[in-house]
């Protein structure tokens, strides 16, 4: 609310200064012939403008209010019913005092508030559009300056040739250590196995008797002492024959 009161006070001072300047500018005219309507109208506009204080929150540039308040519309209707020019003077005074108002919204206030009165304000489009338009940027980002940091695409030459690879592998010696295939000499001489089986015992008793009688002298006779030159195979054969004879004799003894 402080900006609104400041605005109203400055408007009052401005209107009073305008009235004083008008009175001071025409000293030669008689007092009875002086045109008093303009000073009275400006003074009256300054007094009527107070009713539009609630419209500042809607008319200020950057305001987020979707619509004016009911009190604002009542004040606009009061100003327009008194004099449509008062709305125009209010816009001019606010622009001179540094207040940034949206002239498009201000001129559309009669339609927004459903007041069928057109103020017909002569508002220049540049002054009305300067608060809304974005600030003009200085031509700092010119194409030449944008391209000033020239990027040198030339990079240091990279040698794509790979280093020579040595394919020579260390010589592999395929010569294996000599394997001795000579196996230790195995003695293939096996002891003589007597194939004589005790089948002799199954022969007829006549043959058994004859064999026993034939072999008895041998059994009775002392066996010669084995000489050191007799091989082990001979000793084994003799032992087997001796066992066979003993078995046959025992078998014959049982039969007898």
Swiss-Prot record:
Pfam families: LTP_2. CDD domains: AAI_LTSS. Residues 226-256 form a propeptide. Residues 1-21 form the signal peptide. GO terms for cellular component: plasma membrane; side of membrane. Confined to the anthers of the inflorescence. Disulfide bonds join 45-88, 55-72, 73-113, 86-121. Residues 125-230 are annotated as: Disordered. It comes from the Eukaryota. It is found in: Cell membrane. One of its GO terms (molecular function) is lipid binding. Its main location: membrane. Glycans are attached at residue 41. Residues 138-230 have a biased composition (Low complexity). Probable lipid transfer protein. Belongs to the plant LTP family. This is Non-specific lipid transfer protein GPI-anchored 23. It comes from Arabidopsis thaliana (Mouse-ear cress).
